[in-house]
Amino acid sequence: MTDDASTLHPTVPADAPVRVRFCPSPTGTPHVGLIRTALFNWAWARHTGGTLVFRIEDTDAARDSEESFQQILDALDWLGITWDEGVNVGGPHEPYRQSQRGEIYQDVLAKLVDSGYVYEDFSTPEEVEQRHRAKGEDPKRGYDNYDRDLTDEQKAAFRAEGRQPVLRLRMPDEDISFTDLVRGEITFKAGSVPDFVVARANGKPLYTLVNPVDDALMGITQVLRGEDLLSSTPRQIALYRALVAIGVAEFIPEFGHLPYVMGEGNKKLSKRDPESNLFHHRDNGFIPEGLLNYLALLGWSLSADEDIFTVEQLVANFDIHDVLANPARFDVKKATAINGTHVRMLDPQDFRDRLVPYLRAAGLVGETLTPRENEILDRAAPLVQERMNLLGETEGLLGFLFRGDDEIVVAPDAAKQLKDSAPEVLDAALAALEPLDDFTAEAIETALREAIVDGLGIKPRLAFGPVRTAVSGQRISPPLFESLEILGRESSLARIAALRAELAAN
């Protein structure tokens, strides 16, 4: 080991182009915290004109799955988060899957051992605990650096017993300080972090080694990741110093630790919480523009009074130094409201087209829309764009327009709000609509107002509820008169007559 490791700690050159990375493990369904990390790395790369590298940390064969990997790709593709190097794209540092980089890690590991930065540890956990007890210390305190200076004779004796050593990196006997891009100056006191394992007894390198090695070889300038990884930073800085000394790394990257994402009750959002599942929100009808906007707010904002912004505005204004250190709470209501604003910002034709998958999922239309279904959608979409927060509301708002007259079922809350005057109102509506030659929204409104508001003396706020329930089955629907026009005379009259008959029968 040279003396340079403790004194020569090169930092990222001021003129170095930004190179950031997103390196998830393919385990489980993508969660909002993971995707927020991807988003912030992507936004910083795009803002600075830098490079985003996408790696996969797939060294845990027991937990990694191809399904999870495909879900990560699906999530990034849906949100429009692209990368410049990495999986499925290629680049100068292939391969980008850790499971395919074993020879690289073994080569680096051998150099670390040869130079003395990494040493063999033969102690069993029981022996470590016994040594702590003998000193009157907590037996669960962790490794005590006992094997740092074993002689060759001691190592040979342990091997003769059949012991296989793990490999540990020597932590420097000094404070380790760094300036976090989000949190400012952070110091870990000397002795607070024990020497740590970088390879198992079977020789397999651990995440603690391979992650920084990949970052070093790929020239990553900023490591932007979750706050849960903050405690690992002093170990990685120590490893970087060693990697610089042996010529693997050119500099130590900057670190920025993004705030925790909290759930209900100010608890950290768990992977088991439905709100943490990115696809849960997609299935409920979030659009990429709305969800990206809200995910960016989990630690960053355009300004103190601007919650709504486009992806282009995010890229133009994002600065990692502006990210807040305080935990961010995932508020579903606020996220939904923000999504609604983005729904209303969509081009009308784009909005109309985005409703189709939700109609299809509800079984309301087939793979290809019929001419009549296209006509209904063309006319109905503008009626609900200003009212919709989630595209998942499509079935509830528009389903009645695509169902047959005999498929309308009155919802319990709609039935409950029908007054005693409902039969009379429905009779008046039938009488007013049957003779109409011009079955347009304007003519329908005039006829119904004259028949129900003027003729029956019912207040406008209450006058049309029974008609709305008859044609839609709901208490709330798109504008009634326009809906009747879309349904047409025959369906409108059939549905009103059906509810009138049902009320008479009961």
From Swiss-Prot:
**Which is one Gene Ontology cellular component term of this protein?**
cytosol
Motif, 'KMSKS' region: chain positions: 268-272
Q: Which GO terms describe its molecular function?
A: ATP binding; glutamate-tRNA ligase activity; tRNA binding; zinc ion binding
Q: Where is this region: Disordered?
A: 124-147
Q: Where in the cell is it found?
A: Cytoplasm
Q: Which residues bind ATP?
A: 271
Keyword terms, alphabetized: Aminoacyl-tRNA synthetase, ATP-binding, Cytoplasm, Ligase, Nucleotide-binding, Protein biosynthesis
What this protein catalyses is:
tRNA(Glu) + L-glutamate + ATP = L-glutamyl-tRNA(Glu) + AMP + diphosphate
KW Transcription (keyword) present:
no
Question: Where along the chain is composition biased (Basic and acidic residues)?
Answer: 128-147
Motif range ('HIGH' region): 24-34
EC number(s) stated in the UniProt entry for this protein: 6.1.1.17
Single GO BP term: glutamyl-tRNA aminoacylation
Quote the function comment for this protein: Catalyzes the attachment of glutamate to tRNA(Glu) in a two-step reaction: glutamate is first activated by ATP to form Glu-AMP and then transferred to the acceptor end of tRNA(Glu).
Describe its assembly.
Monomer.
Q: Which NCBIfam families match?
A: gltX_bact (TIGR00464)
Entry-linked PANTHER family? GLUTAMATE--TRNA LIGASE (PTHR43311), GLUTAMATE--TRNA LIGASE, MITOCHONDRIAL-RELATED (PTHR43311:SF2)
Which family is this protein grouped under?
Belongs to the class-I aminoacyl-tRNA synthetase family. Glutamate--tRNA ligase type 1 subfamily.
Q: Which HAMAP family match?
A: Glu_tRNA_synth_type1 (MF_00022)
- Mind telling me what this protein is named? Glutamate--tRNA ligase
Which organism encodes this protein?
Kocuria rhizophila (strain ATCC 9341 / DSM 348 / NBRC 103217 / DC2201)
**Native organism taxonomy:** Bacteria, Bacillati, Actinomycetota, Actinomycetes, Micrococcales
